[in-house]
Amino acid sequence: MSGRDNRGAGGGGGGHQPLSNAMGKLKEKLTRVGDELGYHRVESNLSTSNTATSLDTILPEDPFLFPQVSPQRHPQTVRTQRLLEDEPPLSFRPLLEDDDINEPPTQQPHRSPLRASGSLELTPLPPPPTSLEIREHRDRQQRGAQGDELQRSKQSLKGSRVSFERRDTGNSNTNNNKAAESSDEDSFEEKRTGFQQQKATSVDHKGILKDLKHILANDNRRQFQAKKHVSLDVKGTRFLQDLLKESSSEEEFHKTRREFQGRKHQSLDPRVTFKLDKVLQGSSTDSDEEGEDAEHKRLIHRPKDITKPVIIDLKDLESESDEDFLTSRQHFQQQRSISTDSRKSRRLYEMDEMGNKRGENIRHAVPFVRQITEDGKPKLEVYRPTTNPIFIWTQVLAALSVSLGSLVVGFVSAYTSPALVSMTDRNITSFEVTQDAGSWVGGIMPLAGLAGGIAGGPLIEYLGRRNTILATAVPFIVSSLLIACAVNVAMVLCGRFLAGFCVGIASLSLPVYLGETVQPEVRGTLGLLPTAFGNIGILLCFVAGSFMNWSMLAFLGAALPVPFLILMFLIPETPRWFVSRGREERARKALSWLRGKEADVEPELKGLMRSQADADRQATQNTMLELLKRNNLKPLSISLGLMFFQQLSGINAVIFYTVQIFKDAGSTIDGNICTIIVGVVNFLATFIGIVLIDRAGRKILLYVSNIAMILTLFVLGGFFYCKAHGPDVSNLGWLPLTCFVIYILGFSLGFGPIPWLMMGEILPAKIRGSAASVATAFNWSCTFVVTKTFQDLTVAMGAHGAFWLFGAICFVGLFFVIIYVPETQGKTLEDIERKMMGRVRRMSSVANIKPLSFNM
C-alpha cells in the first residue's frame, strides 16, 4: 500500500512515463481508426502534468445511445477515463459542414475525483441499448414530431379560416362576379361547404360579427339589423324608416339592400343563390337611369289588393330585370328565411323542389310581408298565396244552384206531414182517402226513392252530373202539379212516386256534383249549404202547411223547382266527368269557369287525369262480387247496420206524421205550431252537429244520440199509454213537444249525419261506389218500411207500442255502436282502411262525399 502510494505521489519523471506512452499509443490507434472510417478527430488536450488524461469527442447524433450526455449541449466534450490500450474508441461523428475543426472545447475536462491522489477512476460505458429499446425510442420521437406538425397545422388552419372569411365576406362583390361567370355549380357548392365547415368550427363569435359588420361598410349594428331583417321579421321593419332617412335616396337604399341580400344569400343554397347572383348583377348594372327610376316606381307603387300569388320557377330566374330579382328574392325568403324552424324551412324547400318538377307551387306557402309602401313606411299586409286563388263567386253560384235542388227535396219529403191532415178531411177533399191509402201516400215516396237511387248511379256516369240533376227539375214540377190537380188517390200516388224517384236521383247526384266542383279550401263551408237548404225546405213545408190545404201546398211545391232549373243552366258540368269521358279541353274550360279565368288550372287538370287513370286501372267488371269478399263484408255490414238503426229509430215516421202525432196527443199547443217548432229545431240542430262532430268524436255523439232517443221514445210511449189506459195527462200537454225537441236534437247530433259520414270513411276505396249505392238503397228501403208501416203499427199496437218498439231498436243500436263501430275521428282514409282491412288503396274522388240527409 505504501509503495503504491509512493508511486502515485511521486515526482514527475518516473511515474508519468509509462502513462504517457500508453496514451500516445491510444491516441494513434484512435486517429488511425477515425481516418479509416472518415470521422473527424478533435485534438485532445493531453497533459502530462495531470494524473488523468482527457479525450475530447463530439456529441453523437442519437443521444439515446449515450445517455450520459445532455442533448441540449452541442458540441460537447465527453471525458473518458480509459487506460487500457485494448479498450475500443469512445465516440465519433461524421464531419458536418458547419463544424470548425480548430474550435477549442467549450467546457473544461472533467477531472477525476481521485486526481489529487494521483489515481485514475475507470468508468465503463453503459451497455448498448437493445433493438427493442431503440425502436420504442424512435416511435416516441416520431409521435412527438407528428404532434408538433398537427399543432402547426391547427395554427395554419385557424389563420387560413380567418383569412378565408375576410376574403369571402369583405370581397363578396368579387366573389359574386366570379360565381356568376362560372358555370360550374359543383365548384361553387364545394367552396361554400368548405367555408361553412371552417366557420362552424370557429368559437370566435366576436370575429364573425366583426366580419359581418364589415360587409356593410362599417355600418353600426342598428343599421345592420335593419337591413338584415327587412321583409323577414315584422319587428325589424321598425328600423326601415330610420334607414331611409340615413340614405341619400330610396334608390340608394334599395341598391344597398339588394346587394346585401345577394351577399347574405351566399353560401345558403348554391342552386338558388348561384342564379340569384346573376340576377343581382343584372339588376345592379342597369345603365339607363330613367328606366331604372320608372321600374323602381312601378315596383314601389304596387296595388293594395294583391291576391294573385307569385309563381316562380328556377328556370325563370335567368332574367336580368329588377322585377324578376325582387320577386325571386321574395319567393326565396318565404321558403327559407321567415320560419325560425330550420327543419320546417327545409321541408318547405323540398316541397317546392317537388312542385317545380311537376309544374306546381306550394299550396300553402308561408305568408310574407310587403316590404314598403309609397311613402317608404312599413306596411304589414300579409297574404297567403296558394296554387290557385279562390275565385269564390262562381263556386258559390254552383253550390247555391245545387242547394236549391236540395230545398226542393226537403219540401217534397215533408209534404205528407201537413198535407195528409187536410187530404183526409172530406170537407176539403172531393175524394175519399182511407187510412190505408194515406199510408201509401206517405210510404210510396221512399219506395220510389229506392228505385231512383239505383238508377241515379248509371245516370250520373253516362249523362253527367249536371245533366242528371237538370233532368230532375221538370219531373219535380210535373209531380207537384199532378198532386195539386188530383181528382182521385191514384193521381196523388203517381205524383208522389214520380217525386220520390226524382228525390232518389237527386240525393245521389247533388253531393257528387258539389264535391267535384268546389275547391277543398271551401268545401267544408259550401258543403253545408245543401243540408241547410234541405232542412229549410222541411221548415218551409211545415210553415206553409199551417195556412194551406194539400192542393195549394202542392202548387207551391211546383213553383220551387223553377229557380233551381234556371240556375242549373248557368253552371257547367264537372271537370272530373269531362276527364272520365276524355274531353280534356271541355274539362279545362269548366275549371277556368270555376277557378277564375286568370287561374292556372293545368296542375289541377293533370291531377284529375292521374286520378282517373288510377281509377281505370283498379276498376273491375264484377264490382258487385267484390262486396261479398270477406275483407269487404265487415265495413259494408257496419255501414248497413248504421243505416238500419238510423231509420228504425223512427225519424221519418216522426217527420212524415208530425201534425197527426200532435193531434192524437191532444197537446195544449196547436199541432201546426208544434210542427213549426220541430222544423226550426231540426234546422238549428244541423249546425250543432257539424260543430261537434270533429271535436267530440263519432262514437261519443252516437252514444249521446242513442241515449237521448231511447229516453224520449220511452217517455212518449208512456205518455200515449197513460192517455189511452191510465190517468189523465191533459195537464202534461207540453210533454210531447218537449220530447220531440229533445228527440230531434239527439238524432241530429249523431244518427242523422254520422251514418252517411262513416259510409264514406270506412268503405274501401275499391268498392266505395258500389257499396255506397247498396247502402243508400238499403236506407231508402228502411225508410219505406217505417213510413208505410207506422200507421199500421199504431192501429195494431197503439201509438205507445210503436214508440216503445222504436225505443227498443235504439237500445239494441247502442250496443251495436259499442261493439262494432270504430272511431274514425282524426284518422286518414288510409289509416281507417288499414285498420279495417289490413291494406291501403288510393282513395276515390268522392271520399268525403255523402248523399244528402235531412233526417229522412
UniProtKB/Swiss-Prot annotation:
Q: Which PANTHER family match?
A: FACILITATED TREHALOSE TRANSPORTER TRET1-1-RELATED, PTHR48021
Modification Phosphoserine, positions = S247, S248, S249, S319, S321, S844, S845
Q: Mind telling me which Pfam families this protein's record contains?
A: Sugar_tr
Which GO BP annotation is one of this protein's?
A: trehalose transport
Q: What is this protein called?
A: Facilitated trehalose transporter Tret1
Q: Which family would the database say this protein is a member of? A: Belongs to the major facilitator superfamily. Sugar transporter (TC 2.A.1.1) family. Trehalose transporter subfamily.
Q: What does this protein do?
A: Low-capacity facilitative transporter for trehalose. Does not transport maltose, sucrose or lactose. Mediates the bidirectional transfer of trehalose. Responsible for the transport of trehalose synthesized in the fat body and the incorporation of trehalose into other tissues that require a carbon source, thereby regulating trehalose levels in the hemolymph.
Task: Report the InterPro entries cross-referenced here.
Answer: MFS_dom, MFS_ERD6/Tret1-like, MFS_sugar_transport-like, MFS_trans_sf, MFS_Trehalose_Transporter, Sugar/inositol_transpt, Sugar_transporter_CS
Q: How does it sit in the membrane?
A: Multi-pass membrane protein
- UniProt lists compositionally biased (Polar residues) regions at 69-80, 170-180, 329-340
The segment annotated Disordered runs over 1-27, 62-202, 326-345
Organism of origin = Drosophila erecta
Ribonucleoprotein is among the record's keywords = no
Q: What is the lineage of its organism?
A: Eukaryota, Metazoa, Ecdysozoa, Arthropoda, Hexapoda
Q: Subcellular location, in the record's words? A: Cell membrane
Report the transmembrane regions from the record.
390-410, 440-460, 473-493, 497-517, 528-548, 552-572, 636-656, 673-693, 700-720, 740-760, 767-787, 801-821
Which residue intervals are annotated with compositional bias (Basic and acidic residues) in the record?
Answer: 133-142
- Stretches assigned to the Extracellular side: 411-439, 494-496, 549-551, 657-672, 721-739, 788-800
